[in-house]
Amino acid sequence: MKVRASVKPMCKDCKIIKRKGAVRVICKTSPKHKQRQG
């Protein structure tokens, strides 16, 4: 999980979702692409 000021999709499988007021990126194919805005 990376904490970043700006989250961007890193591949075609990355999905941007809003969870509990935080913007997140989840990715099934490569979980190291997971990000959270903070």
Swiss-Prot record:
Q: Which Pfam family, an example, fits this chain?
A: Ribosomal_L36
Work out whether the entry's keyword set contains Ribosomal protein.
Answer: yes
Q: Report one GO cellular component.
A: cytoplasm
Protein origin, superkingdom: Bacteria
Q: Care to name a GO molecular-function term for this sequence?
A: structural constituent of ribosome
Q: Which Gene Ontology biological process is one annotated for this entry?
A: translation
Keyword annotations for this protein, in alphabetical order, are:
Ribonucleoprotein, Ribosomal protein
* NCBIfam families named in the record: rpmJ_bact
- Family (UniProt): Belongs to the bacterial ribosomal protein bL36 family.
Q: What is this protein called?
A: Large ribosomal subunit protein bL36
Record the organism.
Answer: Mycoplasma mobile (strain ATCC 43663 / 163K / NCTC 11711)
